[in-house]
Amino acid sequence: MPSRHVFQLGTALSDPRTPMTNAYLFLLAVLTVLATPGPTNTLLASGSAVAGIRASLPLLLAELAGYLIAVDLVGFLLRPLLAAQPVIGTALKIVVALYLAYMAIQLWRRTGQATSGQAVVTWRGVFIATLLNPKGLIFALAIIPFGRPEVPFYLLAFGLSVVAVGFLWLVAGHLIGAAAGERRRLVPRIASVALVGFAGLIAASAFG
């Protein structure tokens, strides 16, 4: 990647006042943020590791719905409010951290209670985790150029990217589960620990 593009990407991601209007940088930023490990991707991978790719495909719709609602809500309605009242952003981080901790407990319990092949990650769980995912703020404030007439096309490209990257996480989870063999049910347990870690990082950023 040319150094100029690296600089532009870093500038846009660090400054919410500079949403991306260059299609190349837009796709690069979206794919980079989506591919980064986080709560949603952790749930997708752990669900696929236990239930398989086909049974986990509905989770992609949950992820897509969660991201689109979150991004549109922030991009069209909450941008001025978040800029004027930073305390709201802090409160949102605390809520996200608490929910991820709750999700970690639920995932750990369901893993122990579920029978072989039964899904341990639910549609609702992925939807809410994605709706509250801090990545949504990054997309809405720093990447998607809200306010421009072509924003519907950016949202379409964003939605397609969500499904594509999410599917790759399902594949990755399935491969991890296949490699783990009979120990595949440990994958959601590991994922629950990861969710606790994400919750801690988000809580720390809220009070830092």
Which role does the model predict for each range below?
Residues 21-83, 87, 142-158:
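Juxtamembrane transmembrane-helix termini in multi-pass membrane transport proteins
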Residues 28, 61-65, 69, 88-91, ...:
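Hydrophobic residues within alpha-helical transmembrane segments
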Residues 67-70, 129-141, 195:
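Core segments of transmembrane alpha-helices
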Residues 40, 66-78, 100-103, 137, ...:
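Alpha-helical transmembrane segments and their lipid-water interface positions
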Residues 110-125, 178-183:
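Flexible interhelical linker loops that connect adjacent transmembrane helices
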Residues 83-112, 165-169, 181-208:
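Selective transmembrane alpha-helices of multi-pass membrane proteins
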Residues 7-36, 57, 116-132, 150-163:
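Small-residue-enriched transmembrane helix starts and helix-helix packing motifs
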